[in-house]
């Protein structure tokens, strides 16, 4: 059984000498971490399905890379117990050690003896049950620095849309798509096991293989559009999330308190599902029958399609004139849509104008 150990050293490098309530005191964070990061949901088994790095060594060793397994367990104090299993030169190798938690949720520190390097790692985005993206800033005592991004999955694959968002984040970090290493699914290896390489076959043979069960999505959900997984009961109540990318894209989110679709700035990748291109898409995804009890509140607007609003007093769906919009989510884009949500139209009302 081949086994190596990653040993943490005191935080004497880079001026990281202090502690705060047992946590390492590090420089100001380089990246924002996942909002409301929940460590108890994050621990468990992950697979590194894709990565990129500015480190030349990483790029030189990209051929035929196999997906590895990372198991995280909460240890005593402010530490994470880490067990990593991966294929290395035809042999399954297991490495174990500890990561230091920091005072910033989602930020982790560890030291690599082999490279004499400190690693400052940030969980920039995760939905816990499916994928996680981590950015790592590595600094050696020699002064050499590098940045790596890793895409982890609870299974051996990720949806195409998640991989696309990972690629977008890589570009925002100044690296190109051709630096991304998409790892191969060769199954979970067993420490000490010798792997018989079979280049002519899609996957190598093994004397025995232990495959972990899927923990989250079924196989048919391994790819496809995010809309197929849209959960309005959760998504429409979520706060708007910019995501880890640095773009400035105008989007709309549903404010479940005011029952309005409101503007926010989207970074361009990841974030959550409360993110829509148009007000119409936002309303049609998120509004409920409760909007039928909202008052009619016409207001002037430009460049918007003709809408209908439900008059709760008369029980009618009322058309608005061109150039008039509704100030809340009691707005529909056809009489049929209004009737479907709010009931039978008793009588057509007069065209309304803003007061």
From Swiss-Prot:
InterPro entries: A1-microglobln, AMBP, Calycin, Kunitz_BPTI, Kunitz_BPTI_sf, Lipocln_cytosolic_FA-bd_dom, Prtase_inh_Kunz-CS. Disulfide bonds join 92-189, 236-286, 245-269, 261-282, 292-342, 301-325, 317-338. Expressed by the liver and secreted in plasma. SUPFAM superfamilies: BPTI-like, Lipocalins. Residues 236-286, 292-342 form the BPTI/Kunitz inhibitor domain. Gene3D superfamilies: 2.40.128.20, Pancreatic trypsin inhibitor Kunitz domain (4.10.410.10). GO terms for cellular component: extracellular region. 3-hydroxy-L-kynurenine binds at residues 55, 138, 150. It comes from the Eukaryota. SMART domains: KU. CDD domains: Kunitz_bikunin_1-like, Kunitz_bikunin_2-like, lipocalin_A1M-like. It is found in: Secreted. PROSITE patterns: BPTI_KUNITZ_1, BPTI_KUNITZ_2. Keywords: Chromophore, Cleavage on pair of basic residues, Disulfide bond, Glycoprotein, Protease inhibitor, Repeat, Secreted, Serine protease inhibitor, Signal. Coiled coil: none annotated. PANTHER family: PROTEIN AMBP. In the N-terminal section; belongs to the calycin superfamily. Lipocalin family. I-alpha-I plasma protease inhibitors are assembled from one or two heavy chains (H1, H2 or H3) and one light chain, bikunin. Inter-alpha-inhibitor (I-alpha-I) is composed of H1, H2 and bikunin, inter-alpha-like inhibitor (I-alpha-LI) of H2 and bikunin, and pre-alpha-inhibitor (P-alpha-I) of H3 and bikunin. This is Protein AMBP.
